[in-house]
Amino acid sequence: LDLIPESKINEYKNSIGYYDLVSGHKVLYGDNPFDFNNLHVKSESIPLFEGSWLLRNRGIGLILAGLYFLGKNDNNSINKENLWIEINKAKIAVGDSFLISNKKYHWSCIERLKRINNSSNIHYYKEALSSKLEHKGHPYNVSEKSLIEEWFNIKDYFLSYFLKYEN
């Protein structure tokens, strides 16, 4: 989350970041500078562009992660954690953009899982969000070969989904 001056916070009202800030974050220490109860932010007002932005941002991360191992003969130098993180960010971006396009996005990961259950996009999304929620699935016990295979699988799925989303 970036630091945004209080005077400019309203300029970001239709963004995912603003919605998540207002709806899902709590002040743990100190005074709350915002009157969250009067901001009335609705996820339905998040524009489709935010989903496109998520897909572009996470797609670039997926590409950069792939560049770490493409063309290398020795896969021992792969940073498995970075590769795993970018794969999961891409999976989550697919699900989040789907929810945004259907006006069903929610700040809570648990609620997002409930809202996407009847979708064809559920497999990758559910896997990634469940891993995030349960703090499991870290790549330490996964072989480089398995991670690279997963990267190719999600890359193909991600590209197909992205092109459909943009149309």
Regions from the language model: what does each represent?
Residues 117-130:
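Short, well-ordered alpha-helical segments
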